[in-house]
Amino acid sequence: MLHIYKASAGSGKTYTLTLEYIKLLLGYRDEQGRYRLYRKSDAQHRRILAVTFTNKATEEMKHRIVFQLDILAHDTEKSPYVDGLMQLFGCTVEQIRGIASETLYVLLHDFSYFNISTIDRFFQQVLRNFTREIGLQGSFEIEMDNDFVTASAIDRMYSELSDVDQKGLLNWLIHYAEERIESGNWWSLGNRSERKDDLRELAGELSKETYKLFRNEILSQIKDKSVLDDYLKEMRRIRVEFESLLRKLGEAAMAVLERYGLSPDDFKGKGRSWIQYLKKIVDGKVEPPTQTFRANVGNRDGWFLKKEIPACIDSLYEELNPVLQEMVNCFGEPYVRYNTAVQSSKYIYALGILVDIDRRIEEYEKEHNVLLLSDTAGILNAVINENDAPFIYEKIGTRVNHFMIDEFQDTSKLQWQNFAPLIGESLSHDHTDLIVGDVKQSIYRWRNSDWSLLNEGVQSLFRPSQYSERSMNMNYRSCACIVEFNNRIFGEAARLLQQKLEREIEESALVEGSFDVKIEKAYADIGQRVADSNLLRSGHVSVTMWESDKKEDFYNDSLA
């Protein structure tokens, strides 16, 4: 069973994690679902992998488990876990003390196999067993300095621009620079000492998972610039065809009005009538029709005021409405394709240059026998996708039965894709796994974290019978006034933000559904309860509003 804990701040997450780990160390669940103590310790810590986000958190978790295990072994009655463990396993204090003492002894004498680490470190350990598959020597080093390697790759690219076979790249760099300047952005071909180097900033995209998830496909398809040239031509064709069709429809609609001696000002609303939209289309503007325009297509009663309905309304409606309907239809799937063409055309030169930088980074890694830390998750993803879990365990020389992932809201999509098959293998053998996190505390988007995994991604991967969800909403840390303040302000903020998002989706004519109640769902468990021990504690909440729009003023005032 995969246990998913959604643990809000101060809800006892640390206590729960430690308890769950110790439960796995001391006992097991039999075929009837009952928990039993091990008769003797069998180095269970070797078959449990607990991962978290930082080295500090890793050390704290190790210390906490050893410390609590020591209390269970030597001062059992004082352990905060002993009563729960006795009830769970149906055993005595002496039995808990005995197995805890033996387990602690085995753990301390086998400490190097105490598998609590950061996600990155675990991935590196696995990769070292697949050096042949990834094309590196067994002695490869992990390179932490992405900027240095990127700068070296760009320097090499610059030095090769005079080569005959790099003429295409030179032209792309020129086009990219021109595009940046025309769009009002700065452009700098700097060197390592300069803070602003446009290509180095662009190369930062290579470490983002939005690129890594499609990297292999991109590199295989873009082997030369002619592919991208053909793509640009196709995107231009899509844009021109859509804009031409839309303008023709606008002109056709205006022609109908002219034949009947009417103009947009004759419709309900006069100069602000819904059909004034036609003028924008005829002028070549591409923007979705308003909700009012959409509502009046197919509804002739809303076209004119009752006292101003022209005698030709029936024939006008029969001629004009089909044209208007076709215009609205343009802003379905055709508009999505058009927008895709417009947006992708803006970045196609950047993509071509990125591919060249990426290939030179790969050359640097092979020449220096290093692997960028930011590449480990992506490379391991390819390894795991090509092999099943038993083979991976065979390669790394150990088998993990139980997985525990802390701070799961900071896990990235690639990292989860690496863990998911291993957890799936664990669940297929009826083992226990644990995920703990809080979407409201996801603060590492700059490191590709994806809070939606905890919100909905994990649940969609497994059957309902394979996982359980629990919201830990008791706050043991804060007094009543703080908890109540947070409940009210964040609950209302989530509701207002969801409404704002829905309005923007509606106004932009985007397809509805994908963001429906997404924010409200993420904050569905925002409400916390106050622990009895904190009900009488006093506290204070102060809210200060700053009128200045300058960030510097905000920082200075908030730190004062």
Listing of model-derived features with the role each one plays in the protein:
Residues 111-124, 174-184, 190-210, 352-357, ...:
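Core structural elements
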Residues 31-33, 37-38, 42-43, 71-77, ...:
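Short, polar/flexible loop-turn hinges at active-site or ligand-entry regions and domain interfaces
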Residues 121, 134-137, 152, 156-172, ...:
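Accessory nucleic-acid engagement/destabilization modules that flank
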Residues 186, 193-197, 471-560:
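Helicase-core coupling region on the C-terminal RecA-like lobe
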Residues 191-370, 553, 560:
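Conserved ATP-driven helicase/translocase motor core recognized via long
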Residues 16, 20, 60-68, 122-129, ...:
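Alpha-helical scaffold elements adjacent to nucleotide-binding pockets in ATP/GTP-utilizing enzyme cores
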Residues 1-133, 364, 371-374, 379, ...:
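P-loop NTPase Walker
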Residues 2-9, 44, 49-53, 57-58, ...:
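Conserved helicase NTPase motor core
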